Each structure stands twice: as C-alpha cells, then as structure tokens.
C-alpha cells in the first residue's frame, strides 16, 4: 500500500468530505426545540434523532445536494443514543455533516442533568450511620428512579471490564466512585494468601490494615466488593466479599477469581501460591468511604446515588448521571458522514461507534468521560479519525478493526493527529487499540490501518496495542503509560506468526519505566521497528519468541535494558500445533496467493517446521546510550537465527539538539550516526501532533510532570515474568 505524507492525507480527507457551502438542506437542532418543528433556524428540531428522521424523508434530489445538521449550544441529552443508518448516508461529493452552529458549543451527553434542587438530604438513619463522621451533613442523595434510571443492579460476585454502575460527570471531570484507599491509583496490598480458591471456593487472604472492620454493615447487606490485581499485575478483577474474620484478619470471597488469588510468581513446594505481598486491591462503592468532595456510591437496595457534591454545581453546570450503555452516537452501515467539532461525554458505553460503512470522518471533536471507548470503529472501509481530543475513558480512547487477513484486503482506516490521554480508567485496555479486542469489546480482524501523528499519554495501560498485519505506525508520541498495570508497551504487538507487514517507524516513546517501548509479545512475527527513539522506558525493545522481526536503526536512551530478544517459544511450546498460533497460520494459507507473494517468510517458516526457536530476526544499526544492558539475546545455540551487527553503545546527550528538553534530533555532523553505515535521519520534529484545519494549536507537554512524575506505580518486571514462565 502506498503511504503519503500527513498533510497530503489530510488534504485527501478534506476533499472527500467536501465543503459546507454547497449544502442546500440545513437542519437545526436545539435542546429547546419542539416536537414537530421544521428544523429551520427559527424552528429547530429537539434532537439529532429527529434530524435523522427528517433526512430519511428527503427526496433523492434533496439528498444529492447535501445535508448539514447544525447543533445549537447547550446540553443535548441522548438517553438512548442516536443511530445514523445507511438511509442517511451522504456521497463522496456531498457528505452528511453533523456539526455545531457557528459560534455554538453543543454537548452531546447521555447524562441526566442534576442540579441543586435534586440533591436531597440523607434522612435514612441506617445510611447516615454508615457515613464517615466528616461526611455526614455533606453527602446528598439522588433518587435514581426520579431520573428514569430503573434497571440498575448490584455487581455480580465476580466481574472485570463492564462493571461501573453509573458514569457521573461534572464539567469535564469524571467524579470518582468511592474507594479505599483514596485516589485513582489508590491501593493497599494483601499480606498473604491462605486459600487460593477453587471451583467451589472463593479464596481467602490476610489483609494488612484494620479498615475492613468498618465494612460490617455493607457485608451484612451483601454489598461489599473489592477490585484487585489478584494474580498478575496486568489483570484486574472485582469480587464480592462473603465474610470478614476480624480476629484472623482475613477476607473470603464468594466465588473464585479467574486463576485464583496470590501472585503466580511465588509458589511453595506443593505448588500453592502464598502470595508475595504485592498483590494490590481496593474497596469500591462503599458509603463508608465517601470522604472527599466528588466521591459517590450507589445504594443498590434503595436505588439511591449518594454523593458529596463538589463546588460549582448549578443549573448551568449540572452533575450528569449516565446509565445507558448504548453508544451516544452510532453510524450503522452509514457512509460519507462527517461528525465535526462536537463535544461528546457522559455514557456507560462508547461515545461514538462506527459499524461497517465507508468513508466516514470524525474530526475535531472533544470526547471524554465515557465508561467504554471514545471512538470505536468496527469494520467498514476508509474511516478517518482525525484531530480529536479523547480523554477519561474506562477502556480505550480509540479502537479500530477492519480488513480481511486471509486475502490481505486492507481496511484503509486512518487514525491521525489525535490526543489520547487518561484511558483505561476502569479496565486494562490500551489508549489506541487496533484489532484484537479486550474487556470492553471484540473488535475482530485488522489489516492495513494507518496510525500517525497521535499523542498518547498518561494512561493506565498500554499506549498502542495491535493485532493483525500490514499496519503502519509512524510519527506517534507515546509517554507516561502503564500507570496502573504491567506487561505492556508503548507499541504492543500480539499478532502471532501472521503479524507480517506491521511497520513502526519514526515514533518517540518516553518516560514509561513500567512499559517497554516496542513489545512484540508471544510469538509476534514479521514486524519492522526502525527509526524510533525510546527514552526512559523499561526496555527499548522486547521480543518474545517471534520470527523475522527487524529492529534496525533505532535510538535507545536511559533504558535499563536496550534490546531483549528471547526464546520463550521453546518452554511455552510455540509450535504449529498450538491452537492459537497454528490455527491462525492455517486461516491465511501462507503457501497460496496473496500471502506467498507479499509475505513469503511465513511460508518459509511453516515449511521449515521448527517454530519454537527464533528465526530470521535482525538487530542492526541501533544506538544504545546509557542502557544498563545494551543487547540481550538467547543462548548461543538458540540465537543462531538472529542477525546482529553494527550496533553501538557510544554517544551522549551532546549528540542531540536539546536532550534536556527531550528534543532528540541528531545534530548535523554528529559522530553518533556517522559510526553506523546507512543510518537514516530520523525526522524528529515531525513526530507528534500537528496543526491542521481542526487542531489550531499544539498543547504543551507538562515538563515538570515528565521530569518528576512517577511512572512505576504498578511496577512490573518483564524479566521476572520471562524467567517464571520459562520454568513451566
């Protein structure tokens, strides 16, 4: 696939979307609109749904002239979400455009607005007794039934991704569900494990603090749940507490948490996991733990939202309480639809979802405060997600899939110039997810997706995670990832043996000491990682047992390990008989067209038969500066299939234009690159966000946070994981 520079791609996008000037039909929508309105500027429709119905009634000739839906300022409440289907599609010359009226700031939200008069005093004596003494008189209650929220149910005995009962928002901030310990990364740890749990038993652990003594009333009401990293530091699950023994200092669950409790890295002689004292957990949704303004909890029995209102609540700035899990705006098999310049927030589902269709555009939007994904693209062709700000999501900021791997038909999607931050707040998913799927959704196959010029930062999990093949990742900046998880990467590939054609070039990954900059995990093969800069990451490159991966002409600075390639495929039996790896290979027929022509290495790998030992990998021309271990390869007998040459460990900050301020442009005439034959220039100034039609300026990075912030809150050792797994 031919790839074009970023400005040209945007120009193509703008041509496809077209200009508003030619649109002959304008439909105005206002929160104050009336049912039966005409949709004129003076008689606006009450909702986008009404606008969609009006579009369906237009004649083909009217649609052919183009349609624009213009939203007035204010909160557009979408309690059930809105679906734009194929009957509303535009064309390549005149798309359907959904945008704001000139000068207006509309907000699409699934949140019921709640202001002062709906915040009632807590009168139930048993509830008041449960509140912290400092919170009594400050906590208010909201009767959910008065908001029309009637289907809310308690958490199950074990839960993972889709767990949040409500999304509660004020302004641009998601208000936190009550927890102990406080803080978005507030956790305590287990002291030890007395029972790992089984199919018939939930497991028991010893707690450290006497805080659980306060939770006896919640326990008596069967409304006590904990969330924790019970077994490994990259999977968080919730579990309902069955009992607390305050004499023994133990907590017992109703039901077994997947894999049991207790770190998998510490086993006794009998194979029982006694725990290593680092397993992190917290209590959630307890009235007893509402002790700060903004915190809230749901009383499932009484159908009440208990909240300590923060300052600033008013009719103009209400608390938004969202309970609907449908996407706020869904393009369902629609094509040539442009959603531009809108603010979308407050949902238990996705903010915006594209299902099938072709050539849709989401551009210049401000998307936040949703419990699932900001923008989800599920199939279709040539969709573009351009220059959006996406933050405060429970799962991924952007997720996309499409294309057909067996035929190498590309999706053609483009994810360009987006600022994605503070994702994975509720469950461990990457900021940008290409294919694979996860806790929030199953995305499916992904082929031929272009991810460029994005800024990904301050996220609990991975930066960009991908499956599939033939993707291009270039000019992205990724930093401060893995703030609440482990075993992840700035770029994390989970593609198996069929991951050929994935290119990562000219990216900058930095300040992520709990993540590896480029991580090709569990047999991922066929990737090209070239011309990238990794600074202050756990590892610059980590390859786990893959083949035909090329790590060439990268710069690694201040990483404890520069480049690590291992042979885990031997101990983990990465053979063609493996259901995951072998089944994936069979699904693409590597000895037939188009695979045999485009990616002949896969057919060669299969023909050779031996797939447990690394084959065809290269480590060439890399610069490693101040890395504790520069290059780490398997034992010589297993490293014969890895080509290593021309790598250097010399160099200093003086070789770069402004290393102190993280500008790693190599100075002209530097001896650093001259020492490596064929080292291509890295266009460092082109990395990251760019000014375009939708993004008028580039937000500054928080330099103080970069210099002083902690990125090891959930410290994870890839080396420990490799060693432990290889002993199986």
Locate predicted features:
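Glycine- and acidic/polar-rich repeat regions and solenoidal domains
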Residues: 81, 349-353, 371-378, 391-663, ...
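Bacterial N-terminal signal peptides
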Residues: 7-18
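Extracellular polysaccharide-degrading/modifying enzymes targeting complex plant/algal/animal polysaccharides
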Residues: 28-355, 361, 376, 581-595, ...
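Boundary at the C-terminal end of the N-terminal hydrophobic targeting segment
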Residues: 21-24
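Positively charged n-region of N-terminal signal peptides that target proteins for export
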Residues: 1-7
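Beta-strand repeat scaffolds of extracellular/surface proteins
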Residues: 32, 72-74, 87, 100-103, ...
